[in-house]
Amino acid sequence: MRACQPTVEGVVERDGVAVRFERYGEGEPAILLLPTWTLVHARHWKMQIAYLARHFSALCFDGPGNGGSYTSTEPAAYSDVAYARNAVAVLDAAEVDKAVLVGLSCAASWGLRLRAEHPGRVLGAVFIAPAVPLMPRLPERRVQRFDAVFDDPVDWEKYNAHHWKTDYPDFVRFLMGRIFTEPHSTKQIEDATGWALETDGETLVASDLGLLGFDERTTRKLAARGTCPVLVIHGSDDAVRGHGEGAALAELTGGELVTIAGGGHFPHTRDPVRVNMLIKQFADGVAR
Amino acid sequence: MRARLPDRTGVVDRDGVRVAYEVFEHNGPTLLLIPPSAITHGRVWKGIVGTLARHFRMLITDGLGTGGSDRPLDPRRHAPAEVNADLCALLDAEGVDVAVVVAHCHAVPWALRLAADHPERVLGVVAISPEIEVAREHDHWNPKLAPPGWDLHNKSLWRTEGGYRKWIEFFFDQQLPEPHSTKQYEDGVGWALDTAAEAKIAGDAGLGEPTADEAEQLCATLRCPMLVIHGSVDLCQPVARGIRLAELTDADLVILDGSGHLPHARDPVKVIRLITGFVHRITGEPMTTTTWTRGRSRAKRALYLSSPIGLGHARRDVAVAKELKTLHPELEIDWLAQDPVTRVLEAEGERIHPASRWLASESAHIAAESTGHDLHCFQALRRMDEILVANFMVFQEVVEEGCYDLTVGDEAWDVDYYWHENPELKRGQNVWLTDFVGFLPMPDGGDHEAYLTTDYNAEMIEHIDRFPWIRDRAIFVGSGQDVVPDTFGGQLPAIRDWTNEHFAYSGYITGFTPPDPEEIPAIRERLGYREDEMVCVVAVGGSGVGRALIDKVVAAYPLAKKAMPELRMIVVTGPRIDPATFPERAGLEVRGYVDRLYEHLSVCDLAVVQGGLTTTMELAAAKRPFLYFPLGHHFEQNFHVRHRLERYRAGTCMDYATGDPDDIAARITELAGKPVDYRDVETEGAERAAHLIAELL
């Protein structure tokens, strides 16, 4: 059973594609839980929704390629511009004027774009484990070559288009080990693996290519244009996107940084209580 | 002493009538606190100001008729419009654009009018125990229906000799229905009687409280967020008024169940947290860059609090902490401590929590409470109430942020008291350490002091009966025999029986090992003491309170020297007494500070000291003859320490009041260098205490 059921389940059509969204609760402000990379869908917010719906209202939607929204094998469908348009369409459809954004990992891209381009609709933005191209790759990821063909890829060599298309479950298995560096994460790994296996390697390749346009220059430009408050939450032991990325984003946006010492890349599922309380404190502050 | 002094005081003068106020500077939002003058003044906020001033900018007015303000007798000068103008003038004078206004009782309508007339200046209102006509008042304000006592609310009576005091004493008794409110009662009566009946009569006459209709209209015009705090057993203002006011203004309502009319005085911790939460809600709680460590990633951490009254606690606590670290090498210990404890901790390389700088000084308070050779330590502790609550709030913030597994409080009165008063705030395991149990009255305090000590003991006993889970372990530094044979007073149990049931015994903790007899000659030589001289060390501890005793002993010196020519007297004055202010005499040396004083004490031929536990027990452990003079009115030194020393057959108790230089000289010559038959002082105390604590980790 879910902890709570949606108040509204809807589908909004945006430029000919259908975006599925859910609204939980009636309170103000709305917390817009952004989709992240296609690896998982909106269920990854399952530990946040009931709590946020009780204090505010929670709004979430699936991105392309995984979950109940449209799918595509065209990289353009996965650009940050497309995600931002989906988000605005969902806000319109749910009749939400202003929201607090919460985004995980590469949702920082569309989060930053929404914050910069729709200042009237964004009260504040929480970036959890943000993936932003502000720092060099983590040392262990320097072996990764997305377009190469490895016979028997190991470790981050598995972050590779060919491998995803040939042995997607193996990549998922590997990545889960890097996302959840905290001991005793079996349930979180099972959940995320299940969501990941609802899509396929082909789609993931397209989604990854779609993100390429979000380079350092774009990041800095959009971060500078936005004005609303920012909170960054980043695990000290994040083995997917280093803690330095979160710190750099906080600095760039003038936001506050909360470090989860001992935390990995999915702190919202692994330390949901602390993350929920941080989101609430932040939302209370920006919505007063 | 106050927990914190204002950064500035100011006066607004409107047409020659002056209203006094205090300012506590801070970058945060401004809070304007309005007391219900002329029944009381700005000091009524003493329990909450020290803490709020760490988070907000504070403006505290005395209100007309009280404190530092003028006492106009024309009722028209007390009219609501005039009060409103005074408050605006104050805000103008301080350049305050917007403020959150906190008001109590009949100051609440003033705050509401300010918010209604100047909505742009009032961010929010906290109304505590509001006196406002939105619901019926208690019958006892109606002369025809008033129960006994309330008829003292009578202007004619107030104008008679002692009449106003009668009313005030009755009234504050009614305001504090909570048991064990003696200190709040004394404070309230004292502040009320700071002013004369005529000023209060003028204030009442000019009060111009809104009628029921006016009050409802006033509420309807308010737009700012509000918080109403009201005690369920408020005998001055019925809680129905707070409830109705909250309905009419769409305010947050917090009913304090079991509280009377003065929750900010009687439950300061709760009220501070409510006000802080409200202000943060309306102004935004600042998010701060910080680290939260996952539970599994945390090292075991302890927060150690060591009472700063005397240095004895510091040394024994360092000894216990060292033993604790041998039992749990991974344990990180932070100290929340203040001077002079921090000097010992710094020398030992211990880690002092940075929030320590926020602590209000307990030792300065104790010094301020001392005169001559006298320190009424029970009353001094009572009068330390606002320092204790301010320091507790620092502590609470530290434990909430620091995720400590364990708190050890060596006579940390603030933690022990306020965790029992606010048990939901407890974090982690908690150890209470003390070397005495039971407040005892001094005989010359009469029945009233016995009533007070009994009341304090009863409150402590009730605390522990009701919330046995606040003290996870209570350790008595000593053995069962060291507990005094008295009772807690009244119908309360015998102290020793109760302590046996509620404490574990560690044995005495010296914090140092006394030298073996064969080591003594070498130490004496190193310290410059010859075999053929009688070395008498006179020491009075670190506070300024020792001057009177030193003067008397120095006066005895020539007499003693005459009878004992080999006498050499070393007087150690401590940092607060200037050695240059004593007469020069052959064989008499006056020093301000002596490094490792305990070494001197442990090899001297005689010591003359006050009645403090640590120094006397060091002498007992080192088997030195000594004279000790308990401080006047210091129940701990006069009863608890003396009882313990007698059990060890150690030292000779002297009465400062009756002991003249002749007596002192005679005792010095009689006892210097004489063998003693003291009972051995245990040396395993720190280890035993550490074991008792370590079991909790």
Q: Which sequence ranges carry the predicted segments?
A:
Chain B
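Conserved HGGG/HGGXW glycine-rich cap/lid loop of the alpha/beta-hydrolase fold
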Residues: 13, 17-71
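A nucleotide-sugar donor-handling region in carbohydrate enzymes
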Residues: 440-444, 448-544, 574-576
